[in-house]
Amino acid sequence: MINYFELSLKNLGVSFTSESIDKLKFYIKRVLLFGSRFNLVSKNDLRFDAVLLHALDSVVGFPIIKDNNPHQVLDVGSGAGFPGIILAIFDNSRKYVLLERSNKKVTFLRMMSLELGLDNVKVLERDVADEKDKYEFITIRAFRDIREYASILRLILKNGGLIMAYKGRFDKIKFEISHIESLFSKIEIKESAISDAKERNFLLLYK
């Protein structure tokens, strides 16, 4: 499975070293160790390969980040670190700010940042509605339906900035777009560059 992950990284144009792969393995073992205690992933996903698939799903967003080249990325609702920690492991060229309201998950994220030596990671414990800073690039993977949060996210998005939402089926995205299209200057849907059994699309919201 690790070989498949490395091949996928190459196909995505993501650089990696033996050190970054070792960090990924260490992180996955930590998720498995603390998963139940901190409610990091579902019980069905408390397996190495299952967590690795979450990591792969996280990293497929990297080409979009690379194309836009933001100085800093805000990951809203980071949870166990998907996609924020994973992106930070394989991309040390920019800063990743992980926003999470759960104290348990914040504790885990800060522990991972320290243990992995991720100097490009900053963890904030607060709800997105309480965030005051503005960001040029925002990622969200935790929200099933973006309609409830679109107006809040727009407030913390800089002019000309981009929200990249990890989404599923195309038809469900179209339904969500119909309710939020007036909030953004441009909206795009981009397919995942990695084919998998689970349909993955990216909803791109430009301010």
Swiss-Prot record:
Gene Ontology molecular function terms on file: rRNA (guanine-N7-)-methyltransferase activity
Keyword NADP: no
UniProt cross-references to Pfam families, sorted A to Z: GidB
Main location: cytoplasm
Any single Gene Ontology cellular-component annotation: cytosol
Cysteines engaged in disulfide bonds, as pairs: none
The keyword S-adenosyl-L-methionine is assigned to this record: yes
E.C. no: 2.1.1.-
Subcellular location: Cytoplasm
InterPro entries (UniProt xref): rRNA_ssu_MeTfrase_G, SAM-dependent_MTases_sf
Key words of the record: Cytoplasm, Methyltransferase, rRNA processing, S-adenosyl-L-methionine, Transferase
EC class name: transferase
Binding residue positions for S-adenosyl-L-methionine: 77, 82, 100-102, 141
Protein family according to the UniProt entry: Belongs to the methyltransferase superfamily. RNA methyltransferase RsmG family.
Free-text function comment from the UniProt entry: Specifically methylates the N7 position of a guanine in 16S rRNA.
HAMAP family recorded: 16SrRNA_methyltr_G
UniProt protein name: Ribosomal RNA small subunit methyltransferase G
UniProt organism field: Borrelia hermsii (strain HS1 / DAH)
Gene label: rsmG
